[in-house]
UniProtKB/Swiss-Prot annotation:
Family indicated by similarity: Belongs to the UPF0161 family.
The UniProt record lists the keyword Nucleus: no
Species this chain originates from: Endomicrobium trichonymphae
Coiled coil: none
Stated name of the protein: Putative membrane protein insertion efficiency factor
GO CC terms in record: plasma membrane
Length: 74
């Protein structure tokens, strides 16, 4: 599922380069989704992406919001 999701995000990113950019955050929501799924896997990455998209609304200030770094196991 992870590879399918990453492929679909790549397809979306290719198509979206021809559309005006509207994301309020850096990195963009699609880049965030790709990084989150690549780092945490399909399920946790999708949950992080969902939370990010919920925050991306018209009256949100936006700004720099990277994917959280994984916690190191001791």
């Amino acid at each position: 599922m992870k590879q399918i999701a990453l492929f679909l995000i790549k397809c979306y990113k290719f198509i979206s380069q021809f559309l005006p950019s509207i994301c309020r955050f850096q990195p963009s929501c699609s880049t965030y989704a790709y990084q989150a799924i690549e780092t945490y896997g399909f399920f946790k990455g999708s949950l992080l992406t969902f939370k990010r998209i919920i925050r991306c609304r018209p009256f949100c200030a936006g700004g720099f919001d990277p994917v959280p770094l994984p916690k190191k196991k001791i």
